[in-house]
Amino acid sequence: EYAYQLYYIKNAEKYYNGEATADELGINVIDDYTLEVTLEAPTTYFPQLLAFPTYAPLREDIVSADPEGWATKPETYVTNGAFKLVRWDMKDQLVFEKNEN
């Protein structure tokens, strides 16, 4: 359970506990490439927190289509870097190739 890592974001803990809506979260989509995050309080180490996979932005359509398996299948695993996952042998190896996008 890694939800607590997101509690620095405004209303994230309340959202997790069913006390706030998604619209009340301190996350605003500016455009296809930009998110604006509002924090509960100044958090000087927030940039370091962004290195955790918990903070990776995800496409809702991918997660909703396969809530239990999207993160373990190369065809649905979402990446946003220089490489994409092409094979995942659980507890053995991950194989990546250059992301042409």
Residue ranges and their predicted role:
Residues E1-Q5, E36:
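Aromatic- and charge-enriched surface segment that lines or borders ligand/interaction sites
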Residues A12-E24, I30-Y33, L39-N101:
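Gly/Pro-rich hinge or "lid" segments in bacterial periplasmic/extracellular proteins
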